[in-house]
Amino acid sequence: ILADVAGGADLEKAAAQTAETYARLPGGEETAQAIQAALRAPRDGAGETVESLGGGWTAEEALSIALYACLAGNSFEEALLIAATHGGDSDSTAAIAGNMLGLLDPAAVLRHRWAEIVEGADIISQLVRDYRQLSSDINAAEELFEVYPGG
């Protein structure tokens, strides 16, 4: 999903395509169903809706809740709150949602008031700047290889 979004795909379309792919894979049914549940859920952000997707205790449930939060939230903060304020494994679902949101709109994340209090914010900001540079200038790859060696 994230690779498709990084390539310019819409989150909802990327998720639907991923669900279709997983539905065809041996053992992929649970993941496909979890993604489809997030896509079908009403975009009301209600706790009951989040809980209908599970508790986030399995990878499939955590992905479903994080995806739902990103689709249901009208802002970075609202989406992250949806992912973080349920009775399940909310630290995991919020972390996954935060990564999705950062990919969807890195500028909104970096200028949000919470960005200043995140541990490692300076490192995260540098990674975002480098990613954005690479996304807009393929020639930056050689320069960034010096910073991030290993291929």
Question: Predicted segments — roles?
Answer:
Residues 61-147:
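Catalytic phosphate/nucleotide-handling subdomain of diverse soluble enzymes
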